[in-house]
A protein has these predicted regions:
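Glycine- and charge-rich intrinsically disordered segments
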Residues: 1-30, 167
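Non-transmembrane, amphipathic alpha-helical segments
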Residues: 26, 30, 61, 65-68, ...
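Short, charge-rich amphipathic alpha-helices with coiled-coil/heptad character
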Residues: 37-71
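Generic structural signal for well-ordered, non-membrane alpha-helices
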Residues: 40-43, 71, 78, 85, ...
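Short, well-structured hydrophobic secondary-structure segments
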Residues: 57-94
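Extended, amphipathic alpha-helical coiled-coil scaffold segments used for oligomerization/tethering
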Residues: 81-128
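Long amphipathic alpha-helical coiled-coil segments
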Residues: 85-95, 124-157
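Acidic, low-complexity, intrinsically disordered peripheral segments
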Residues: 158-167
Length: 167
């Protein structure tokens, strides 16, 4: 798999997740670095569309990159599922704690829900980061597909401009 999507070993990931105060910041840094690296990678692939010899090589590169991103996306979705499981467990625990042990009586379920969300703000923020990054990865796949389809158009344009047939 590409170095861009090096997510670390399972132990490294678990270690990162246990460091709560620094965990979200590390996640933000990890996501931001992946975004920056992919921005550079997409620009490099776009630049390869400028010349025909590079365009021919580009097709093979694009297929490999798409597979890397799809594999990464699948891994990321698995992590999101684990995070959602953790969220649901914690939400249930918070709900039970408020309903059974709280000294405060909440007038509505909406008030209870707001209190739970306030108590779980860190986990909600982490889920939001995961969701935003998943959307970014999906858009990256679409961009790579767009470049792949641009290859054919680039070759056709070159044929029109030069009158040369490529085989």
């Amino acid at each position: 798999m590409s170095d861009i999507f090096n997510m670390g070993s399972a132990t490294q990931v678990e270690q990162q997740q246990t460091e709560k105060a620094q965990g979200v910041k590390s996640l933000e840094d990890h996501i931001n670095s992946i975004h920056l690296q992919w921005n550079k990678e997409i620009q490099k692939l776009n630049d390869m569309l400028k010349t025909i010899p590079d365009t021919i090589e580009l097709e093979n590169i694009i297929f490999a990159k798409i597979q890397d991103v799809v594999d990464y996306y699948h891994t990321w979705l698995n992590r999101m599922a684990a995070l959602n499981h953790k969220y649901n467990q914690r939400y249930a625990a918070e709900y039970n704690n408020i309903k059974m042990n709280a000294q405060i009586r909440y007038s509505t379920e909406a008030a209870v829900r707001m209190q739970i969300e306030a108590n779980m703000a860190d986990l909600i923020y982490e889920r939001d980061l995961y969701n935003q990054h998943a959307e970014y990865v999906k858009e990256t796949i679409d961009t790579l597909d767009g470049i792949r389809f641009a290859i054919k158009n680039r070759i056709e344009l070159e044929k029109l401009m030069t009158g040369v047939e490529f085989k």
